[in-house]
């Protein structure tokens, strides 16, 4: 990624669950720290899987983070001396996160975001599509399909070992007890109970 002088930019790391998004975010943030840059990291309060005040990858790597409930809370922090701003699990924030990321970049910050691009139904997971569109750099990572070992771009939600239904709630915070990576061929979304009754 080239540096733009006198302005910031947005980097977007995306892909399915278990593709290494948080790992890559942590790696980029640590590089900033090694370069003696001032780094601040934010994460959504809803994501309390591993630690309340840290971003933790599935591999166990971690970095301190500020826990926030809404994207607007980012702007309540003094970021005047900050070089790099990290934001994890962007899909859990409201669409306003896109405008906030743009504002931060326009003020000269390097904004590094990470989040799912698709929900468990393999549908675009807002606000990631919008954020990807306004980012200077987009990295889409692949996981490995839990069924066949092929590259995986989808996240399979499992409820008691069975595929989730299409009308289940979009947000269900979990890790390997509820989700696994799948390729296009092995990704399954069960019909709703209503659809089954109509058949």
Swiss-Prot record:
The protein's Enzyme Commission number: 2.7.1.21
Any single biological process term in GO: thymidine metabolic process
Binding positions for Zn(2+) per the UniProt entry: 145, 148, 183, 186
Subcellular location: Cytoplasm
Protein family per UniProt: Belongs to the thymidine kinase family.
Pfam families: TK
Biological classification of the source: Bacteria, Bacillati, Bacillota, Bacilli, Bacillales
Protein name (database record): Thymidine kinase
PANTHER family with a match to the protein in the record: THYMIDINE KINASE, THYMIDINE KINASE, CYTOSOLIC
List of catalytic residues: 89
EC class: transferase
